[in-house]
UniProtKB/Swiss-Prot annotation:
This is Ribosomal RNA small subunit methyltransferase C. It comes from Shewanella piezotolerans (strain WP3 / JCM 13877). CDD domains: AdoMet_MTases (cd02440). The lineage of its organism: Bacteria, Pseudomonadati, Pseudomonadota, Gammaproteobacteria, Alteromonadales. Transmembrane segments: none annotated. Its EC number is 2.1.1.172. Monomer.
């Protein structure tokens, strides 16, 4: 099933007929494959690892699939399609990336939902693109087109992240935050409670949903002998975490994982401020799956140590998978669950 944005793109397939096409920031569907009905070849860069995995079975010579914050090649295309990002700060980066991978006078196509800020696109396009033209408006989505009028600037990573100091119970750390990765530029309340109650860990530890690497940097600062895996589903978060490790002179294994599917499965500890906060049924199911996977990936005697909004129903699934529920600390908003695998 294609998303509304993808459906609107496909009904404008004459825009990229017989073109070489690059798709940036595509959604969780098979749009890149569907484009081949009109395009001569398609390359697609996913910033969400789950979206990349959905497409992976369809990889072919004329359908090149990538995951990360940039393409591994310098290839240029007739058209670049950008899905307007939910994190608006990410949009200028995607436009720069599109510009660098367009042929001279190449075509930019931007699609997005009305409620996602796409209407403001004409004001957001950098001046190396011509004025945006509204090509279609349907299914609560808009398609804009534009043309590259001069060479886009080189992408220098240092232009696309902010660096700031963070005071933690483990000492001061430097955080590097790529555009599109949420940051309050201070220690959020949940992570603060987690780090104030940081236990002594040992061996191989997993930081699940590592984000920009706040927990990882604090943990390794206090306990440098740990072997730490940092996983996230978001390419910009993984790049942020890598930069944070470098800035603090720390070392960790940083890689993409859809849940825990790509992890080693043999950990002495799992630590996390899980990215499940809204309390919806779907979120509850994801949280339940997370606890189940954490138990399966822990060695006997391993420590499960997370912080969660106190209204989220973690207790039942922790009891089911760990035999008991141990709340080691709490305040009026958060609880620290700290359980040993028996």
């Amino acid at each position: 099933m294609l998303t509304n944005a993808s459906q609107v793109l496909l009904r404008n397939s004459d825009l990229f007929k017989d073109h070489s096409v690059l798709v940036l920031n595509y959604e969780g569907d098979t749009l890149p494959k569907a484009l081949l009905e009109s395009a001569s070849s398609v390359s697609a860069l996913a910033l969400d690892f789950h979206h990349h995995l959905i497409m992976q079975p369809y990889a072919a010579k004329n359908l090149q699939l990538y995951f990360g914050h940039q393409l591994p090649t310098q290839e240029c295309f007739d058209s670049v399609i950008v899905y307007f990002p939910k994190a608006k700060a990410l949009a200028p980066y995607l436009f720069n990336l599109a510009g660098k991978h367009l042929k001279p006078q190449g075509q930019l196509i931007v699609v997005g939902e009305n409620k996602g800020g796409i209407k403001s696109l004409p004001k957001q396009l950098p001046d190396y693109f011509d004025k945006a033209f509204k090509a279609d408006n349907a299914r609560h989505c808009i398609v804009f087109t534009s043309e590259l009028n001069r060479e886009a600037p080189e992408i220098k990573l240092q232009d696309w992240y902010s660096e700031y100091q963070l005071q933690t119970p483990q000492g001061e750390i430097t955080i590097c935050n790529m555009v599109g990765v949420f940051s309050e530029k201070k220690l959020d309340e949940g992570t603060k409670l987690l780090l104030e109650n940081l236990p002594k860990m040992q061996g191989n530890v997993l930081d699940f949903g590592c984000g920009a690497g706040v927990i990882a940097a604090a943990l390794l600062t206090a306990q440098p002998k740990l072997t730490l895996d940092c996983v996230d589903i978001n390419a910009m978060a993984l790049t942020s975490c890598d930069l944070t490790m470098q800035a603090n002179g720390l070392s960790a294994n940083i890689f993409a994982s859809d849940g825990m599917a790509q992890t080693s499965g043999h950990y002495d500890g799992i630590i996390s401020n899980p990215p499940f906060h809204d309390g919806l049924a779907s979120t509850t199911n994801i949280a339940t799956d997370f606890v189940k996977a954490a138990s399966a990936n822990l060695m006997r005697g391993g420590l499960f140590h997370i912080v969660a909004n106190r209204h989220l129903p973690y207790s039942d699934c922790i009891a089911e998978n760990f035999g008991e529920v141990n709340v080691s600390a709490e305040n009026n908003r958060y609880k620290i669950y700290s359980n040993i695998k028996r």
